[in-house]
Amino acid sequence: MAKGQSLQDPFLNALRRERVPVSVYLVNGIKLQGTIESFDQFVVLLRNTVSQMVYKHAISTVVPARNVRVGPGGGYVQSNEGNQAEDDDVEQ
């Protein structure tokens, strides 16, 4: 698995498992809302009134509606609607 996906997959999986509502901002500025139904290496299946397959390369930001615990010992990802989500425990 690529190093860039070591946080991405657990984050998306936690959102999917807990059915957390998300706002997905695309690189063209469009905002999509729903819950993550499924995902793979290239796409995210976003569910609202319909299911939408969104290519990951088109996604800029994923903002959860509430805090989400990522991974077994991971920190919380906080929701800042309108701002990019932040992870408390990320070390620089």
From Swiss-Prot:
SUPFAM superfamilies referenced in this protein's UniProt entry, alphabetically: Sm-like ribonucleoproteins
Chain segments annotated as transmembrane: none
InterPro entries: Hfq (IPR005001), LSM_dom_sf (IPR010920), Sm (IPR047575)
Region (Disordered) location: 73-92
Keyword presence, RNA-binding: yes
A cellular component term, taken from the record's GO annotations: cytosol
Superkingdom, taxonomy of origin: Bacteria
Keywords associated with the record: RNA-binding, Stress response
PROSITE patterns in the record: SM
Domain Sm positions: 9-68
Function of the molecule: RNA chaperone that binds small regulatory RNA (sRNAs) and mRNAs to facilitate mRNA translational regulation in response to envelope stress, environmental stress and changes in metabolite concentrations. Also binds with high specificity to tRNAs.
Subunit: Homohexamer.
Name this polypeptide is given: RNA-binding protein Hfq
Organism field: Xanthomonas oryzae pv. oryzae (strain KACC10331 / KXO85)
